[in-house]
Amino acid sequence: MARFVDPLVVGRVIGEVVDLFVPSISMTAAYGDRDISNGCLVRPSAADYPPLVRISGRRNDLYTLIMTDPDAPSPSDPSMREFLHWIVVNIPGGTDASKGEEMVEYMGPRPTVGIHRYVLVLYEQKARFVDGALMPPADRPNFNTRAFAAYHQLGLPTAVVHFNSQREPANRRR
């Protein structure tokens, strides 16, 4: 009998970025016409702009989306774990991340060495974050998704997806 192995466990997202959780809503992400599935490879040049992240849920519910790289600066020495790439808050359910408020501007993947994981984590908010209630993190390196969620009382994630990216070879002219 075949057993299902969660790709978030295999990809070490559960454990290194988030704790074990039960997904409670649907979240899809895409760069252009390329859908993101757990563990897929996305070229950095294809991810220069924020992905389209659609979430289910009721219109009255609000969500926070966080994107990090737990492998910065390199998978063998992740001394900047987690590197923060994006935070969007107050996303209404049943819409997409563009309907929320960008707290930390999107920064696309820029892996320098090795294959990096990029993790999109969605949390349900207890209430709307009003101006001034949230302070953006001081720095992008060494961000901690769990600590951010705990501080803002977000609880466990409602959905998570991750993709891989690696440095693209430079065009060589001869």
UniProtKB/Swiss-Prot annotation:
InterPro entries: PEBP (IPR008914), PEBP-like_sf (IPR036610), PEBP_euk (IPR035810), Phosphatidylethanolamine-bd_CS (IPR001858)
Inducing stimuli: Induced by abscisic acid (ABA).
CDD domains: PEBP_euk
PROSITE patterns, per the entry: PBP
Gene3D superfamilies: PEBP-like
Chain ranges passing through the membrane: none
SUPFAM superfamilies: PEBP-like
Function: May form complexes with phosphorylated ligands by interfering with kinases and their effectors.
Family that this chain belongs to: Belongs to the phosphatidylethanolamine-binding protein family.
UniProt-recorded name of the protein: Protein MOTHER of FT and TFL1 homolog 2
